[in-house]
């Protein structure tokens, strides 16, 4: 896995260097000032939880390195609307192209199609990418502790705070969790995939959740397929899940989302702007 992460970092840093040559940081800052202000990502999750429901971060993902093409019929705005109608709280959109066939455009057009906040799902190695994310419309960024040292993690967090964005800080084990908690961010994601073996187990979330202070919001990631999985995590104080591949493979994404959230088949959408802007 270390070799994979090194390969990813190498091509991402090359991408960043090329992007900086095309668009300066000052120009990016000006772009950020001209876009709609961030929608409250954490607020949207908290609103679902306040209703006693599992909060879903629904992922728009075309492909992955291990599984190849996941969804051939790939229409980000339509998928975003299907997720919103299914009761999702937020979106996660892949913007990495080499490994996931993602695109910045997917993030922008998916978010424009709905009222949900959106996460830029990507490998971040430079605060410049945080400004990119905001310019593209993202409301939240991902900080993967396995990919960054503490100094870089702090710099990414600070850039997000400057822009009024939220951060999802992702951990895989106890050592990463200790480092993540030092960042003092409200949202901690536990990835159930073992980076050494690639095995996925919900026991990872259950084990690490017990070590997270009560004032943090916990997100379960990977290996979540059913309403029963959600209920299992909820019993361990995990009130949010991030799910992508299993929903992307469904023909009726809205119906699949409702089943995952244990919701009735009728529409579950409602006014959210007042909550997010409050």
From Swiss-Prot:
GO terms for biological process: L-tryptophan biosynthetic process. Transmembrane segments: none annotated. GO terms for molecular function: indole-3-glycerol-phosphate synthase activity; phosphoribosylanthranilate isomerase activity. It catalyses: 1-(2-carboxyphenylamino)-1-deoxy-D-ribulose 5-phosphate + H(+) = (1S,2R)-1-C-(indol-3-yl)glycerol 3-phosphate + CO2 + H2O. CDD domains: IGPS. The keyword Lyase applies. It holds the Pfam family IGPS. It is an enzyme of class 4 (lyase). Its EC number is 4.1.1.48. Keywords: Amino-acid biosynthesis, Aromatic amino acid biosynthesis, Decarboxylase, Lyase, Tryptophan biosynthesis. Pathway: Amino-acid biosynthesis; L-tryptophan biosynthesis; L-tryptophan from chorismate: step 4/5. PANTHER family: INDOLE-3-GLYCEROL-PHOSPHATE SYNTHASE (PTHR22854:SF2), TRYPTOPHAN BIOSYNTHESIS PROTEIN (PTHR22854). Belongs to the TrpC family. This is Indole-3-glycerol phosphate synthase.
